[in-house]
Every structure is written in C-alpha cells, then in structure tokens.
C-alpha cells in the first residue's frame, strides 16, 4: 500500500484529492494537513511514501515546506499540486527537491504524475508560451 500525505489549506480540495487517489486500490491517504507547519509534523509522524503539496498556504508556501521536507527526508517524492503552475514555479520547485508539479484542475495529470513519481520518475508538464 502506498501511503500519501495530502497538504492543502482548502478542505474541499483535500477531499477531492483523497477521493481521486483512493480510486486506486493500492493508494491510501495516510494523513492530511492544512498548513505547512502541519505538513512538517505529519511527515515526521506518519512517514508517507509520497506527498501531494499545495503551493499557497496560510503560513508557509509549498516551496519552503518542500525545502524543509527534502532536507530531512530526501527519499520522499513530493508532487506540487497548484492552481499557480508556471514555468518559473516549476523551475523553483525542481531546485528545492520537488519531483513533479501539476494543476489541481487536471485530474488526468495528477494520477499520471503520482504514477511517475512512485516509479522514481519526475513529472513537469510542458508550459505553454503564455506561462514562460
């Protein structure tokens, strides 16, 4: 069973991501967090196999959270799931150890990205010219 931590300040988005992920019989959301600080606590307590992480949260942004998690647990793949996806954000995400990024609204890419990261890959979609 793959244990996944879902981090988003919006409870509706956390519910949506949980429902999406748990359609796979081998994926289980082991914990949820609504802030960056909660995410750090949940990682230490639950030791997930993977993390889905929002970019914009009330206390710390996803880049700062990922930087801290990656320094402590570099083996845990992090997928940034955001509505703020841009080429610049994706490049910054790579630099801090995030292994993938996709739009919250793209159900297909979320599942595809999780699959890629679980198989030691990365997932950064090609950005359109408007986002460069």
Language model: regions and residue ranges:
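Active-site beta3 strand of CheY-like receiver
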Residues: 46-52
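Conserved acidic segment of CheY-like receiver
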Residues: 1-13, 17-21
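A short, hydrophobic beta-strand element within the central beta-sheet of small alpha/beta folds
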Residues: 75-86
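Short amphipathic alpha-helix used as the core "switch/output" element in two-component signaling
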Residues: 63-74
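The feature encodes the CheY-like receiver
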Residues: 58
């Amino acid at each position: 069973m793959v244990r996944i931590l879902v981090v988003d300040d919006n409870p509706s988005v956390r519910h949506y991501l949980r429902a999406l992920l748990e359609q796979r019989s081998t994926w289980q959301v082991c914990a949820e967090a609504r802030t960056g600080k909660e995410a750090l606590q949940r990682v230490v307590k639950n030791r997930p196999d993977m993390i889905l992480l929002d970019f914009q949260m009330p206390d710390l942004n996803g880049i700062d959270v990922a930087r801290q998690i990656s320094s402590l647990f570099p083996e845990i793949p992090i997928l940034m799931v955001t509505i703020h996806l841009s080429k610049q954000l994706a490049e910054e995400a790579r630099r801090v150890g995030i292994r993938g990024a996709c739009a919250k609204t793209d159900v297909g890419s979320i599942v595809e990205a999780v699959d890629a990261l679980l198989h030691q890959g990365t997932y950064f979609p090609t950005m359109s010219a408007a986002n460069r």
